[in-house]
Amino acid sequence: MERGEQVAAKTDNLDTRLTIAAHHEAGHIVIAAAMGLRLRPEGIMVDKGAWGLACFYKEPDESDESKESIIVATFAGYLAQKRFCEERGYSCPLPDDLEVTLSPDSKEARGIETNLSKQYLGTRTVPEVHELLQQRAAELVLQHWPAIEAVAREVASTSLAPLKPLKSGTQWSDQTSARSLPGDEVVKIVERFGIKAVCVTES
């Protein structure tokens, strides 16, 4: 699965929305790399309508550690978007707004949370774990903010090019062009910030 659609930014300025989208997707992919998840060759794409995609391997194995990593990386997109908007004074949906709680990212994370083992949960409820993992994601976004900003800047500075199809064949955008940063380029950027990342092609 390669999906990282951001929560809609509350601005009519397209350039601003593109930059916000770049930070959302950078949040996903940088924290995915920091959590040891493998990146996909497609990397990051933000279409000309300011909707984006972060491509990393989201299929968890049976371990709770794998599920936790994917949940945290999934939360990180909105949290990076929120941090960027707050820094720049842009309006951003609040965590409890329906467009956040019902977003594709939130639904995806909650779906994985229901598959966490009883051993992992212990005496905690799923909602309690949800809050803890959101907090963990927020801490990682803060810790790796320089890397997130560097990746986002690189995405936002690229020129629009014809939209490339995903290797999976999934159509993620109805636009014809997008800004993109391949996975191997993401690896080079985050390594400058001490993150050991891996980009692999699915066999």
Residues of each region from the PLM?
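Soluble catalytic regions of large protease machineries
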Residues: 2-203
